[in-house]
Amino acid sequence: MKEVGIVGYGSDLPKYRIKAEDIAGAWGKDAQAIKRGLVVNEKSVPGPDEDTATISVQAARRALSRAGINPKDIGAVYVGSESHPYAVKPTSGIVAEACGVSPDFTAADLEFACKAGTAGMQMCMGLVGSEMMEYAMAVGADTAQGAPGDALEYTAAAGGAAYIIGAKKEEFIAKFNGTYSYTTDTPDFWRREHEHYPKHGGRFTGEPAYFKHVLNGAKGMMAKMDTTAKDYDYCVFHQPNGKFYISAAKQLGFTEEQYKYGLLTPYLGNTYSGAVPLGLSNILDHAKADDRIFVVSYGSGAGSDAFDITVSDRISEVVDKEITTEKLLESKKYVDYAVYLKYRGKIRM
C-alpha cells in the first residue's frame, strides 16, 4: 500500500459557551466539586442555526483551503457523528455538495459513538493507499446532548474537524506511519431510537470501558511501531472529561508537555466524534517539521483507533491559511442556563 498522509485539515466550534457554575446553579450542585472531578470548566453550545452538518461544512471548507486542491478530485467523503441532523438523509452528501465535490464520489455517514471520525480517517487511508482514488475526506463532528441534570450535561458539547487524506508526498502536512484498532462489545453508553438523551453506565464507563480500550489501543499501536511514549513529541486521546484523559496519558508515560495541546475538554467540553480530530488539529497548529504525534480515539460500545503520525515541513506553510483551533476556542460568548435550554431544544411540553 502506498504511503498516505494528511494534506489538509480544518476545525470549527460554536461561538457560545456555558460555564459549569451556571449548570450546577440550576440544579443546586457544587460547581467547584464538579469542576475538580471532571476537569471541565465550561463547554461549547451550538446556536439555533448550528448542527453537525453546518459544523462539518465549515471544517471541511477550511481543510480544503489548507490543502489547496480541487474539491472535484476528492473521491470519498465520510462524516462520523452520533448526532447527524437526519435519521434518514446523509450528512456527507450535504457536506460534499456545499464544498463543491463532484457527483463522481462515494459518501457515507458513520456511527461508532465518539470514534466515528477516526474510523472515517482509517477508511480514507485505505482507499487512497490502495490507489482507488486521489483524495478522500473524513469529518468527525457532533452536537452532543445530555439529559437535564445528568452528569453528561456538564460535558456534552459541540464541534468538529475535517481531514483530507492524499498520497502525494510533496503535499503531506503529516504522514501516517501506522494505525491500529482495538474493539469489543462493551455496553457502557447507548441511546435507543426515539429517545432524546443517551444513557450510560456511570462508573462502569471508566476502567472496563474507556481505560481498557484506550490503553490497549495505545499499547497495540506502540507494539506495532516498536515505540514508547518517549518517541513522541505530542499525544492526544479521547476526552470525555479532563480527568480520564490525563490519567490515560500518565499511565502510558506521557508528560504534560506532550499532552497539553491535545487536551481541549476543560475549555470546550466533550465534542464526542469531534474530540480527537479537534485535539489533533490543535496539535498540528502548534507542531513543527518532524514532530511525531500519538493519537488514540475511543467510542463507547466500544473501541479505540490509534495512529502514529509524523509532521512534515509543509505544516509551516498551511497553518495560517485558516483560523486555528486555539483562536476558535478564544472567540466565545457566554450564555446562561435558560438560553442554553432554548438553544438546545430542551424545553419540552
From Swiss-Prot:
Active site per database record: E82 (proton donor/acceptor), C114 (acyl-thioester intermediate), H238 (proton donor/acceptor)
Pathway assignment: Metabolic intermediate biosynthesis; (R)-mevalonate biosynthesis; (R)-mevalonate from acetyl-CoA: step 2/3
GO biological process entries: farnesyl diphosphate biosynthetic process, mevalonate pathway; isopentenyl diphosphate biosynthetic process, mevalonate pathway
UniProt-listed InterPro entries: ACP_syn_III_C, HMG_CoA_Synthase, Thiolase-like
Reactions mediated catalytically: acetoacetyl-CoA + acetyl-CoA + H2O = (3S)-3-hydroxy-3-methylglutaryl-CoA + CoA + H(+)
Assembly with partners or alone: Interacts with acetoacetyl-CoA thiolase that catalyzes the precedent step in the pathway and with a DUF35 protein. The acetoacetyl-CoA thiolase/HMG-CoA synthase complex channels the intermediate via a fused CoA-binding site, which allows for efficient coupling of the endergonic thiolase reaction with the exergonic HMGCS reaction.
Binding site for CoA: R203, K243
NCBIfam families: HMG_CoA_syn_Arc (TIGR00748), PRK04262.1 (NF003274)
Function: Catalyzes the condensation of acetyl-CoA with acetoacetyl-CoA to form 3-hydroxy-3-methylglutaryl-CoA (HMG-CoA). Functions in the mevalonate (MVA) pathway leading to isopentenyl diphosphate (IPP), a key precursor for the biosynthesis of isoprenoid compounds that are building blocks of archaeal membrane lipids.
Enzyme Commission designation: 2.3.3.10
Annotated organism of origin: Methanococcus maripaludis (strain C5 / ATCC BAA-1333)
Name of the protein in question: Hydroxymethylglutaryl-CoA synthase
UniProt signal peptide: none
